[in-house]
């Protein structure tokens, strides 16, 4: 199978290297990834400046390009221009730090997989729970098996998989849980400081993760030491509310 590997942490990140090398054992792999860290950039694409792709070399001879754009740019440019042919699958990761709950909306890792799904290509985003991830090889081993399942069974149109693994040795993981996107999110916080001119500036972020309680949520599964596998759809329409909204009879003024 022909696989495009990408991420949002940059082409030299060890998580990408573990994923690339693991998948290359059984598949034809090419890499198109950002030339630098582009985390939490969501589904941004570059329209006002040109994109540039620089061919990279690595010890295993896998064709690779570093792009001065976003993760979504990398998928779009790779599929439409760089690879020469449409890949069978796009895999984004391995991201250090979880992408569960509300944080799917901010994630460049997840958005790269979403871009592939929008282009009609099956895709998987994969992350480990630790922002300073150390068990990328275990995650890559799991992905080899999951990729084989996707190759055999396929994915519905407009749907991709979001995978989160505990950052522990594989033998310590409790199991695999198929689950829904939950409500987990980082606790909202800004750290206010002063610059040398006594003007305030703000660092956004917190490492406190707020989880739900339902065992079928992705964040709860991860907290309970399970691998969380979630099907995510690109169509964001709320069909349950659609007909109710039509009853509002909204009209132009």
From Swiss-Prot:
InterPro entries: SurE, SurE-like_Pase/nucleotidase, SurE-like_sf. It catalyses: a ribonucleoside 5'-phosphate + H2O = a ribonucleoside + phosphate. One of its GO terms (cellular component) is cytoplasm. A divalent metal cation binds at residues 8-9, 39, 95. It comes from the Bacteria. Keywords: Cytoplasm, Hydrolase, Metal-binding, Nucleotide-binding. It is found in: Cytoplasm. GO terms for molecular function: 3'-nucleotidase activity; 5'-nucleotidase activity; exopolyphosphatase activity; metal ion binding; nucleotide binding. Its EC number is 3.1.3.5. Binds 1 divalent metal cation per subunit. It holds the Pfam family SurE. Its cofactor is a divalent metal cation. Belongs to the SurE nucleotidase family. Nucleotidase that shows phosphatase activity on nucleoside 5'-monophosphates. This is 5'-nucleotidase SurE. It comes from Desulfatibacillum aliphaticivorans. The lineage of its organism: Bacteria, Pseudomonadati, Thermodesulfobacteriota, Desulfobacteria, Desulfobacterales. The gene is surE.
């Amino acid at each position: 199978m022909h696989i495009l590997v990408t991420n949002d942490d940059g082409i030299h990140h060890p998580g990408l290297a573990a994923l690339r090398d693991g998948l290359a054992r059984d598949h034809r792999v090419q890499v198109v990834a950002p030339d630098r860290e582009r985390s939490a950039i969501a589904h941004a694409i570059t329209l006002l400046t040109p994109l540039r792709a620089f061919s990279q070399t690595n010890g295993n001879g896998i064709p690779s390009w570093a792009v001065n754009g976003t993760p979504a740019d990398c998928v779009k440019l790779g599929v439409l221009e760089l690879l020469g042919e449409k890949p069978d699958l796009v895999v984004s990761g391995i991201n250090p730090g979880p992408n569960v709950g509300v944080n799917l909306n901010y994630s460049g890792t997840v958005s790269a997989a979403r871009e592939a799904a929008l282009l009609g290509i099956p895709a998987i985003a994969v992350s480990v729970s630790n922002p300073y991830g150390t068990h990328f090889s275990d995650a890559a081993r799991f992905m080899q098996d999951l990729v084989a399942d996707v190759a055999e069974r396929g994915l519905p149109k407009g749907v991709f998989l979001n995978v989160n693994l505990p950052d522990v040795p594989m033998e310590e993981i409790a199991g695999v849980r198929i689950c829904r996107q939950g409500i987990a999110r980082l606790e909202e916080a800004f750290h206010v400081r002063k610059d040398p001119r006594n003007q305030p500036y703000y660092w956004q972020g917190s490492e406190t993760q707020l989880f739900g309680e339902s065992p079928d949520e992705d964040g709860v599964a991860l907290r309970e030491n399970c691998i969380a596998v979630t099907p995510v759809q690109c169509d964001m329409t709320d069909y349950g509310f659609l007909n109710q909204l039509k009853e509002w009879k909204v009209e132009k003024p």
